[in-house]
Amino acid sequence: MASSILSSAAVASVNSASPAQASMVAPFTGLKSSAGFPITRKNNVDITTLASNAGKVQCMKVWPPLGLRKFETLSYLPDMSNEQLSKECDYLLRNGWVPCVEFDIGSGFVYRENHRSPGFYDGRYWTMWKLPMFGCTDSSQVIQEIEEAKKEYPDAFIRVIGFDNVRQVQCISFIAYKPQVLLFLSSIC
């Protein structure tokens, strides 16, 4: 009997507290119906009056699929001279990265042949020319290795990567040599 009295008193206290709490919180009035406001609207279906994020549309040409192949980040630039290669290698060494010379006898660019998943590309990993040049302090040593690789594989693409052995990531990569066969392939593609 006492439990039933206690429970009904508890329900009564909850019911009496509910209206007080509801009156303390203001009702949400952020969204209002526009049905009550008379609006005169003209039926204009001209697409030029639609809202836009730009004044005029600028069309940009995409990368042409024939004749111009992209290899690395700045591969659209002309081939680098030995002086420019030396400056790039100096930059690489100045940042404390380990130079590594790599070559690819194939096409020299990434492609999909063995797997069709979006993140997988064949041709991303090239063959190392020799071991990474740990302890290299002069860009002329890197240029000498590039020249040796060109003599050994004249029809191969040669690139230099800069490896940060502390973070264990590749920080820079650039094409040091493109074979003359590329000119022929570009003209027939």
Curated annotation (Swiss-Prot):
The basic functional RuBisCO is composed of a large chain homodimer in a 'head-to-tail' conformation. In form I RuBisCO this homodimer is arranged in a barrel-like tetramer with the small subunits forming a tetrameric 'cap' on each end of the 'barrel'. GO terms for cellular component: chloroplast. Residues 1-58 form a transit peptide. It comes from Cucumis sativus (Cucumber). GO terms for biological process: photorespiration; reductive pentose-phosphate cycle. One of its GO terms (molecular function) is ribulose-bisphosphate carboxylase activity. It holds the Pfam family RuBisCO_small. Gene3D superfamilies: Ribulose bisphosphate carboxylase, small subunit. Keywords: Calvin cycle, Carbon dioxide fixation, Chloroplast, Photorespiration, Photosynthesis, Plastid, Transit peptide. Belongs to the RuBisCO small chain family. It is found in: Plastid, Chloroplast. RuBisCO catalyzes two reactions: the carboxylation of D-ribulose 1,5-bisphosphate, the primary event in carbon dioxide fixation, as well as the oxidative fragmentation of the pentose substrate. Both reactions occur simultaneously and in competition at the same active site. Although the small subunit is not catalytic it is essential for maximal activity. This is Ribulose bisphosphate carboxylase small subunit, chloroplastic. Its main location: plastid. Heterohexadecamer of 8 large and 8 small subunits. Signal peptide: none annotated. The lineage of its organism: Eukaryota, Viridiplantae, Streptophyta, Embryophyta, Tracheophyta.
